[in-house]
């Protein structure tokens, strides 16, 4: 079974650059305080690291 991470949106995309909004949509997030369980891959980690002020990693699962 693949490792996964649970990502939660903690910031609003209002008045943020379009690139940051697109990154949120790429992670499957669009509303405040929503969570998503995503595969722990380098591409997902990179997207999370691009917008640390908008998302947080809640949990890492095996």
UniProtKB/Swiss-Prot annotation:
Any one GO CC term of the record: cytosolic large ribosomal subunit
MF-aspect GO terms: structural constituent of ribosome
Transmembrane segments: none
SUPFAM superfamilies named in the record: Ribosomal protein L30p/L7e (SSF55129)
Keyword Ribonucleoprotein found: yes
InterPro entries in UniProt: Ribo_uL30_ferredoxin-like_sf (IPR036919), Ribosomal_uL30_bac-type (IPR005996), Ribosomal_uL30_ferredoxin-like (IPR016082)
Keyword Signal: no
GO biological process: translation
Keywords, in A-Z order: Ribonucleoprotein, Ribosomal protein
Domain of life: Bacteria
Assembly, per entry: Part of the 50S ribosomal subunit.
Family according to the record: Belongs to the universal ribosomal protein uL30 family.
Protein name as annotated: Large ribosomal subunit protein uL30
Lineage start: Bacteria, Pseudomonadati, Pseudomonadota, Alphaproteobacteria, Rhodobacterales
Gene field: rpmD
């Amino acid at each position: 079974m693949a490792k996964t991470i649970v990502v939660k949106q903690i910031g609003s995309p209002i008045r943020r650059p379009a690139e940051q909004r697109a990154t949120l949509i790429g992670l499957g997030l669009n509303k405040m305080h929503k969570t998503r369980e995503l595969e722990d891959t380098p591409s997902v980690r990179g997207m999370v690291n691009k917008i640390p002020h908008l998302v947080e990693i809640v949990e890492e699962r095996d």
